Design a protein with these regions (language model features):
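RNA-interacting cores
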Residues: 1-253
Length: 253
């Protein structure tokens, strides 16, 4: 079953992390699922012949925080929420079981107590969906300069290439995960309100993404996959996690 896991963390004396913490959360996730599954996802993933997809996404850490600009750290002093999504039932179940039995999530060198874990299932049953990003969506192309050097061009909601790349990414994920060709129909994307640009330093690489609300319309199977495994690229690095707005169904594992 494809679900969203919402993990509630309760640091006893707060927790301080580097401002650029995506890789720390990513490592914590891999260290909290079945070893064989973690190895498969990390080393192989699901492929469409050219590109491999890990088939999970995670949000920013949400909670009250303060930033130390000099030390480039962020400190969470109270409850912290982390959301993950995946169409992989084994991934969700393994993560939930580990967190509930272990009782902690190891972020860097700190074992942070897990207060509770909620599960939510978002079922897309019509050809449109209103989404809120929980981590920035990244869509880009790698291009060549006249001298032959490569550079990365990032796109924002509203640009034609944004919609084109979003569709291409979704269809590649569909083929990689289900092993069948996706529909030729396209997903239309409409930004709702202001889209906030985020610059993230992931292990020395600067990545640009955009966060906000989006209205998607198109084939239900592609919309469902977008909700389940995230929008755009680099989902397993902490980008493109989304939730359905005003259409929640909640259960607790």
């Amino acid at each position: 079953m494809a679900i969203h896991l919402i993990i509630f963390l309760r640091p006893e004396k707060g927790i301080t992390l580097p401002q650029q913490y995506n890789h720390i959360v990513q490592a914590a996730i891999y260290n909290s699922i079945d070893t064989a599954l973690a190895t498969f996802l990390h080393q192989y993933g699901f492929t469409d012949g050219n590109r491999a997809f890990k088939m999970f996404a995670f949000s920013l850490l949400l909670g009250k925080y303060r930033i130390n600009k000099e030390e480039k750290t962020i400190t969470f002093e109270d409850e912290v929420q982390l959301t993950l999504s995946s169409p992989l039932g084994d991934f969700c179940q393994s993560l939930a079981n580990t967190l509930l039995s272990r009782g902690t999530l190891k972020l860097g060198s700190t074992d942070v107590p897990v207060e509770k874990v909620y599960a939510q299932q978002f079922k897309v049953d019509k050809e449109e969906v209103h989404l809120k990003t929980l981590s920035p969506v990244v869509l880009y192309s790698t291009l060549l300069r006249p001298d032959g050097r490569k550079y990365t061009c990032y796109f924002q909601p509203g640009e034609p290439d944004y919609a084109r790349l979003l569709n291409s990414n979704l269809k590649k994920k569909f083929k990689a995960f289900y092993g069948t060709e996706p529909t030729e129909e396209e997903v239309e994307v409409r930004p709702l309100g202001r889209q906030r640009m985020h610059l993230v330093n992931y292990k020395g690489t600067i990545i640009k993404g955009y966060a906000g609300r989006l209205h998607l319309s198109g084939p239900v199977e592609l919309l469902q996959l977008a909700v389940d495994c995230g929008l755009g690229g680099k989902n397993a690095q902490g980008f493109g996690c989304v939730e359905v707005v005003n259409e929640r169904k909640g259960t607790t594992p």
